């Protein structure tokens, strides 16, 4: 698939990583972040890369367990991603995810 820089790329960890390391920042109110068709300077980026999101309630009777699982998913759980062709999330996304997870309460 042709990316914004005009190069043809294929789906894979290298192209996804190139898209994920682009300089795009998450929306501070929603944490939404798009890495689809990143700027030209990311010439190795696969143009239709995206993040996988989890929608969870901010208030839950199971908040402690939910937070524990989500923290694991965005930290140690990232080690399982490459075997499933998922690129680990970049540090900038991890910081936002941890702040958001911390808001979950009973």
Q: Can you name each region flagged by the protein language model?
A:
Residues 1-76, 84-106:
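Flexible, solvent-exposed loop/hinge segments that line or gate ligand/substrate-binding clefts
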């Amino acid at each position: 698939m042709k990316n914004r820089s005009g190069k043809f790329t294929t789906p894979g960890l290298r192209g996804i990583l190139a898209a994920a390391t682009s300089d795009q920042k998450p929306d501070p109110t929603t944490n939404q972040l798009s890495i689809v068709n990143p700027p030209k300077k990311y010439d190795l980026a696969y143009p239709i890369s995206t993040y996988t999101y989890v929608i969870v309630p901010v208030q839950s009777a199971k908040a402690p367990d939910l937070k524990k699982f989500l923290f694991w998913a965005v930290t140690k759980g990232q080690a399982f991603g490459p075997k499933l062709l998922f690129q680990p999330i970049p540090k900038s996304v991890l910081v936002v995810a941890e702040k958001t997870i911390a808001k979950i309460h009973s």
